[in-house]
Amino acid sequence: MRLQEIQLVNFRKHKELVFAPSEAITVVYGPNGSGKTNILEAVHYCTLARGLNRSLDRECLNFDAGYFLLQGTFADDRGIELSVKVSYEKNVEKKIFINSDELKKYSQLIGRIPCVTFSPMELSLVNGSPQERRRFMDNALSQTNKSYLDDLLQYRRVLQQRNTLLGAVNEKGMDRDSLEVWTEKLTQLACSIVSERLAFIERLFVYIEPVYEQLGLGEVPGISYRSAAGRHANEIAPEELFSFMMQRFREIEHQEIFRKQSLAGPHRDDLVFRFNDTDVKKYASQGQLRTFLIAVKLALHTLVSDTTGERPLFLLDDLFSELDGTRIEKILEQLEGAGQSIITATDRKDGSGVRSVSIEDLL
């Protein structure tokens, strides 16, 4: 998949801007605060229906503008074109169109244009809260597995309903039979989600190892899944997972009623990243964290490509910061032949297959 052209109107710093990257590696360079990242964010909107760093739609308006408009033209690896339009008007929900047809749900865009990102904000994936790592798994799986996205959206609805019911049992003494029904529904969806996540982590690890080796990193990487249902949940056969989780919910039912929330399930699970058998977020330096995250994203890019048969767009914000020249060259080597990569940087970068564009030339 590649971006042929994108137009920004009243988006962030840009009243109007047109950007047409090369089919390989494009580096958009310029000083901090000049609007480079805004271009990546606009592309991200057209692929995943939201901003790069989870900004609110209204925060993306250009100064006093009442609306913004993004129009992107993409082509898959077979050359078939796809147009995406995202329009937002202040105090009105944004609208998304694919080939002029308005989407009924934003989720219909997910997976149509595979996209992998790297951003300094995403360091929280490694050293932040479990929510960041769950979001990482959900985003990756939702782009490659439509049934996972459907299960995830349904799980969130059932979870909300069950939490409401837990509160009603606590406050009004409602009968628990209804709670059992919703627990079964939640558990069925939870088992599907956890099984897919475990399979995803296993596949991702296979891709991380060679990336580490090719980047010349000395550590031995590792990744594991931590279930809120108990430390042995990962080891249970898929056909036995439902019974295990139902039993777990029965054991903690009194706590859940007291706290009015579901205390087990994939919405409370976590990932643990390691190298040399130590937790990355506890012992890694800032430079090691950054390099580890880049390796994970390079591995994810290859995984998505192999899974979908379509090379995803690669959006990399401030990629070269805090990296030495040797490491930068190795990363660029990894990106060669990987499809289209759009990188932002403060300085021009030249190399094989690299086209550098000054942000000033786009304004």
Curated annotation (Swiss-Prot):
Q: GO cellular component annotations, sorted alphabetically?
A: cytoplasm
A GO molecular function annotation here is:
ATP binding
Compartments, as annotated in UniProt? Cytoplasm
Name the Pfam families for this protein. SMC_N (PF02463)
PROSITE patterns found in the cross-reference section: RECF_1, RECF_2
Q: Which domain of life is it from?
A: Bacteria
What biological processes does GO assign it?
A: DNA replication; DNA synthesis involved in DNA repair; double-strand break repair; SOS response
**Family per similarity comment:** Belongs to the RecF family.
Identify this protein by name: DNA replication and repair protein RecF
Organism per entry:
Chlorobium phaeobacteroides (strain BS1)
Q: Gene encoding it? A: recF
